[in-house]
From Swiss-Prot:
Belongs to the bacterial ribosomal protein bL32 family. NCBIfam families: rpmF_bact (TIGR01031). Keywords: Ribonucleoprotein, Ribosomal protein. GO terms for cellular component: large ribosomal subunit. InterPro entries: Ribosomal_bL32 (IPR002677), Ribosomal_bL32_bact (IPR044957), Ribosomal_zn-bd (IPR011332). This is Large ribosomal subunit protein bL32. One of its GO terms (molecular function) is structural constituent of ribosome. Gene3D superfamilies: Single helix bin (1.20.5.640). One of its GO terms (biological process) is translation.
Amino acid sequence: MAVPFRKTSKSAKNKRRSHLALVASNLVSCENCGSMIKPHRVCRECGFYKGKEVKSVQD
């Protein structure tokens, strides 16, 4: 089994992990009901997309 020749320093470890940060997802408000949804997706609350009802939502 391969073993590292030298201990990885804290700065090298942190530089390697610099691209692992999580980014917050974009949220927009639904034009029909105002709930927060991901863009370009059907609203789960009211079933509308681009001003048209595309899915019937049961209450």
